[in-house]
Amino acid sequence: MLESLQPESELLHDEPDPGEKVYECDECRKTFSLEQHFVEHKKTHGGEKSPECTGCGEEFSKASSLTRHLRSRSRRESYKCGNCGRTFSQRGNFLSHQKQHAEERPSESKKTPVPMTTIVRNQRNAGNKPYACKECGKAFNGKSYLKEHEKIHTGEKPFECNQCGRAFSQKQYLIKHQNVHSGKKPFKCNECGKAFSQKENLIIHQRIHTGEKPYECKGCGKAFIQKSSLIRHQRSHTGEKPYTCKECGKAFSGKSNLTEHEKIHIGEKPYKCNECGTIFRQKQYLIKHHNIHTGEKPYECNKCGKAFSRITSLIVHVRIHTGDKPYECKVCGKAFCQSSSLTVHMRSHTGEKPYGCNECGKAFSQFSTLALHMRIHTGEKPYQCSECGKAFSQKSHHIRHQRIHIH
């Protein structure tokens, strides 16, 4: 459900992944991202040959045997660093490692690794096409097409968007990207009417309606509608955190997490409430805050009727009824219903206190605790007693005081 809430810009990378396998049916030209799905589809045409692995050519008597073989190959397939010889079983980890060498030698070309199975498949499909890529074996009819393709491997991006400065390896990707700025959304979903600037994003969106999740984690079996979500998820198993803060050295698994963290150091709070003037570091916090003024709570729990201003809050609330606690501490085993609670809890083990007071230097494990502490310096007391007018800096102190009037 959460995946359906992602902004369109996060749904798909604009450029194709040279390491991602695509299987095309000779009968109907339908394409598949996973070979297991491709093998199952071939059965629908009937009279198929013995199932064969496109990577090594081995034939099998049953499709299930081929499926087991493919899983075994996937586990064994590794990426070897040409600079230091280190091998990786996951492509994402390999790419992160390659960045370290790229930073050491920024002038050198940054080539993307290609799995051997992709090279073998491309060579088989070459046919009579005379121009073949030396990196991945893919062949083309024209030399110009080959040159365009090679930019994927070299990292060359000569086509730059004059609106935002983002660069692309091929002109067609720039043209597709420019729809983001123009506001054009020609691709519309027949199910719900939502429109997209790129056809690929529509295809991914439609999986929300069909329930298709072609990208499965080999570690825990969890499936995703897009490859980028799987890559981010796999970091929860590997512990990989490729994005590091230059100020304090803290590492993050996602680039967006690093971007938000960096605002702590620069003190940036660009989002201001027009009603009361409160400022926020993130737009999502401002939107959530706005509901205090409007009182709007459009998302209601089917179990108890409690309403929420955000659908994500409803999803977390429903876990109270289901007992689902998907986020578990690897140190002590304590489980939580939301990831933010686990993040805060982990600091009790690590002793990390990332939120520091600019006035006195005192540090805190939670931003909310820092916000309360800051009122000591500012003198802010937002909670006022309606009976006697006495004001308090904290809500808990206000509630405790009100008991005096009740008794």
From Swiss-Prot:
Species this chain originates from: Rattus norvegicus (Rat)
SUPFAM superfamilies in UniProt: beta-beta-alpha zinc fingers (SSF57667)
The protein, known as: Zinc finger protein 260
Signal peptide residues on this chain, from the entry's feature table: none
Gene Ontology cellular component annotations, sorted alphabetically: nucleus
Family as reported in the entry's similarity comment: Belongs to the krueppel C2H2-type zinc-finger protein family.
Predominant location: nucleus
Zn-finger segments (C2H2-type): 23-45, 51-73, 79-101, 131-153, 159-181, 187-209, 215-237, 243-265, 271-293, 299-321, 327-349, 355-377, 383-405
Keyword check for Iron: no
Keywords: Activator, Developmental protein, DNA-binding, Metal-binding, Nucleus, Repeat, Transcription, Transcription regulation, Zinc, Zinc-finger
Complex formation: Binds DNA. Interacts with GATA4.
UniProt feature, compositional bias: Basic and acidic residues: 10-21
